[in-house]
């Protein structure tokens, strides 16, 4: 059976020899991967640089702070 270039590209893109490898570590070693906290704290929010107000037509109006300061939300 002859493989064309398109067949070779299809096979190389759809099947990976690393996709379904068995984990050879014992269960006690694998279990240690999932111990401990499973979350991180959220990052601090950046302060807003402009204030957005909406007019009666539904269009936004952007107001910039004076002297490069930050606007409190």
Curated annotation (Swiss-Prot):
Any idea which UniProt keywords this protein has? Antibiotic, Antimicrobial, Cytolysis, Fungicide, Hemolysis, Secreted, Signal
UniProt keyword tRNA processing, yes or no: no
Task: Provide the protein's localization.
Answer: Secreted
Quick one: where's region Disordered? 25-48
Ranges in coiled-coil conformation: none
Major site of localization recorded for this protein: secreted
Q: Name one GO biological process term.
A: defense response to fungus
What are the transmembrane regions? none
Which positions carry the signal peptide feature in this UniProt record? Answer: 1-14
What's a single GO CC term here? Answer: extracellular region
Q: What does this protein do?
A: Displays antimicrobial activity against the Gram-positive bacterium S.aureus ATCC 2592, the Gram-negative bacteria E.coli ATCC 25922 and P.aeruginosa ATCC 27853, and the fungus C.albicans ATCC 2002. Displays stronger activity against P.aeruginosa and S.aureus than E.coli. Displays very weak hemolytic activity.
UniProt protein name? Antimicrobial peptide lumbricin-PG
Give the organism the record lists.
Metaphire guillelmi (Earthworm)
């Amino acid at each position: 059976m002859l493989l064309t270039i398109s067949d070779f590209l299809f096979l190389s893109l759809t099947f990976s020899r690393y996709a379904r490898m068995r984990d050879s570590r014992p269960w006690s070693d694998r279990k240690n991967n999932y111990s401990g906290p499973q979350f991180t704290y959220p990052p601090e929010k950046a302060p807003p640089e402009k204030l957005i107000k909406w007019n009666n037509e539904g269009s936004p109006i952007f107001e910039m702070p004076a002297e490069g300061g930050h606007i409190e939300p």
